[in-house]
A protein has these predicted regions:
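Start-transfer (signal-anchor) and selected internal transmembrane alpha helices
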Residues: 1-44
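Extracytoplasmic loop-helix module adjacent to an early transmembrane segment
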Residues: 34-35, 39-41, 48-76
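Hydrophobic membrane-targeting alpha-helices
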Residues: 17-18, 49, 101, 127-131
Length: 161
């Protein structure tokens, strides 16, 4: 809870800072808004990627699943993928596949969290960028995201693949 408050304070300070920058033309105003979104997304990426595995209801379960996938063969991954998407049996076959592919590059769960956070918040930042016109709109969107506790969604949403 304190972290979310800190994120909101940093987002508010960032909104104040980027709003105070010269924006004599729409292009400059747009650049300031874009830089503010990047600033906030970096904060949200760090919030998500640096959390402890005990934070959130599902993070530890996802950690255990990540460790389990290390011991799972590629054949089992593909059989599970086929049974879910071809035969319609089971669920969430994409998530183990993404984990297994990621583990070709790194077996560190923290790096995986960072990877997921970058993908999620880059997409969220792009969405906010396309749907807002002013820095104040961006702040409201980020505040709603934080206040409604959607900050957990960056990892649990990926598990729905």
């Amino acid at each position: 809870m304190e972290i979310q408050l800190l994120v909101l304070v940093l987002a508010l300070l960032g909104a104040w800072y980027y709003s105070s920058l010269p924006a004599s033309t729409p292009i400059r105003e747009n650049r300031n808004r874009k830089n503010y979104i990047i600033f906030v997304c970096i904060i949200l990426i760090l919030q998500s990627a640096l959390r402890h595995v005990a934070v959130g209801a599902d993070t530890y379960a996802y950690y255990l699943k990540f460790e389990e996938i290390k011991l799972t063969s590629w054949q089992e991954i593909w059989e599970n993928f086929r049974s879910v998407y071809v035969l319609g049996e089971g669920k969430d076959a994409g998530y183990p596949l993404i984990q297994k592919v990621f583990q070709l590059f790194s077996e560190e769960y923290r790096i995986f969290l960072f990877f997921v956070a970058v993908i999620f918040f880059s997409s969220l930042g792009y969405f906010i960028y396309t749907q807002t016109k002013h820095i104040s709109d961006v702040f409201v969107a980020i505040a709603i995201y934080e206040v409604l506790f959607y900050s957990f969604f960056s990892i649990t949403g990926l598990g729905r693949l």
